[in-house]
């Protein structure tokens, strides 16, 4: 079992299988030229699996595959099956922008994937295109429908931004409610790689907008990053607010980047390279690094301090 120095049980790892993405979302991707990491620099599936097998044996029971856009990496369903076959009761999830989900949903479900989180930042084609910097909405909704059709559990994520999509909060909630899926509204997380001028909408403003139409109550907090609320007619939606001082209290996760770095906290610059140990087949060293990462997991993010990570979310797995 993995326990950090603040007595938090670490049982969840987010694994970025690629830093590449086919979107250029305003709140995530850099607004200056950059180069993708060469393929030879990223971990092979076999290397990821060797580490994750170790992590599972140490107490990890939830794995979320992220990116970048994870569906850009070939044979993701094969990797999912490797993990599922090793531990069939593993909570295997995927975070995706949904663009390729229509093509891959059934393969992933058949391989053992259980859940999908999808980005849906607008229901207006022109606004969705402005945010992602390409025409995406139709394909994203097709991906959502296919995921539901094959039996995947789905949540929608919406990053709310001032003057861009903050007038759509109720429309997005209604859309998710009609689809029978949970939607989570996310406060924009300031980072140096986002486009200038993108501003967050405070969670209180989001809740006030919803309260104009719905009465709701807050549900008891679990160890997720979200606060959840239930409307009088039984619909559940969520809020993710990294600016809240309680955001980190029950954090149970660490992150592995595609390039082979273990990260104890999304908002810190510290990272631990396990690629060399994995390529040498040194599982003992990889185990030691895993325990070091857990031991050095901070109590909370330094959101208001200068130490906040400048690492891009698309590099880290968000």
UniProtKB/Swiss-Prot annotation:
The cross-references to InterPro entries, in alphabetical order and at most eight, read: Aldolase_TIM, Elp3/MiaA/NifB-like_rSAM, MoaA, MoaA_NifB_PqqE_Fe-S-bd_CS, MoaA_twitch, MoCo_biosynth_MoaA/MoaC, rSAM
Q: Name one GO molecular function term.
A: S-adenosyl-L-methionine binding
Note on how the cofactor is bound: Binds 2 [4Fe-4S] clusters. Binds 1 [4Fe-4S] cluster coordinated with 3 cysteines and an exchangeable S-adenosyl-L-methionine and 1 [4Fe-4S] cluster coordinated with 3 cysteines and the GTP-derived substrate.
Q: Which CDD domains match?
A: Radical_SAM, Twitch_MoaA
Q: Where does GTP bind?
A: 14, 64, 95, 155, 253-255
Q: Could you tell me the keywords of this UniProt record?
A: 4Fe-4S, GTP-binding, Iron, Iron-sulfur, Lyase, Metal-binding, Molybdenum cofactor biosynthesis, Nucleotide-binding, S-adenosyl-L-methionine
Ranges where the Radical SAM core domain occurs: 5-217
Can you tell me which residues bind [4Fe-4S] cluster 1? 21, 25, 28
Binding residues annotated for S-adenosyl-L-methionine, in chain numbering: 27, 68, 119, 189
| EC assignment | 4.1.99.22
What cofactor does this protein call for? [4Fe-4S] cluster
- What family does the database annotate? Belongs to the radical SAM superfamily. MoaA family.
Quaternary state and interactors? Monomer and homodimer.
Q: What is this protein called?
A: GTP 3',8-cyclase
* Species: Nautilia profundicola (strain ATCC BAA-1463 / DSM 18972 / AmH)
Query: What lineage is this protein's organism placed in?
Result: Bacteria, Pseudomonadati, Campylobacterota, Epsilonproteobacteria, Nautiliales
């Amino acid at each position: 079992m993995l326990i950090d120095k603040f007595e938090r049980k670490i049982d969840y790892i987010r694994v970025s299988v690629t830093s590449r993405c086919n979107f250029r979302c305003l709140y995530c991707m850099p607004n200056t030229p950059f180069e993708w990491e060469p393929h030879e620099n990223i971990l092979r599936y076999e290397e990821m699996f060797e580490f994750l097998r170790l992590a599972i044996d140490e107490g990890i029971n939830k794995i979320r595959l992220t990116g970048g856009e994870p569906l850009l990496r070939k044979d993701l369903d094969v990797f999912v099956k490797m993990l599922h076959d090793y531990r069939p009761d593993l909570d295997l999830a995927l975070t995706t922008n949904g663009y390729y989900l229509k093509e891959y949903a059934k393969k992933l479900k058949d391989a053992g994937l259980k859940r999908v989180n999808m980005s849906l930042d607008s229901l207006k084609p022109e606004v969705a295109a402005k945010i992602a910097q390409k025409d995406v909405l139709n394909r994203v909704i097709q991906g959502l429908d296919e995921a539901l059709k094959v039996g995947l559990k789905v949540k929608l994520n919406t990053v709310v931004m001032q003057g861009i999509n903050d007038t759509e909060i109720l429309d997005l909630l209604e859309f998710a409610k009609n689809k029978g899926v949970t939607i989570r509204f996310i406060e924009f997380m300031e980072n140096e790689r986002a486009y200038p001028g993108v501003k967050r909408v405070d969670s209180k403003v989001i809740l006030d907008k919803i309260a104009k139409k719905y009465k709701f109550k807050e549900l008891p907090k679990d160890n997720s990053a979200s606060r959840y609320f239930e409307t009088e007619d039984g619909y559940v939606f969520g809020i993710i607010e990294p600016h809240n001082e309680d955001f980190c209290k029950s954090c149970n996760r660490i992150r592995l980047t595609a390039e082979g770095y273990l990260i104890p906290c999304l908002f810190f610059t510290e990272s631990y390279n396990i690629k060399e140990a994995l390529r040498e087949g040194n599982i003992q060293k990889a185990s030691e690094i895993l325990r070091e990462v857990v031991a050095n997991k901070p109590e909370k993010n330094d959101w208001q301090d200068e130490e906040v990570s400048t690492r891009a979310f698309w590099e880290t797995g968000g």
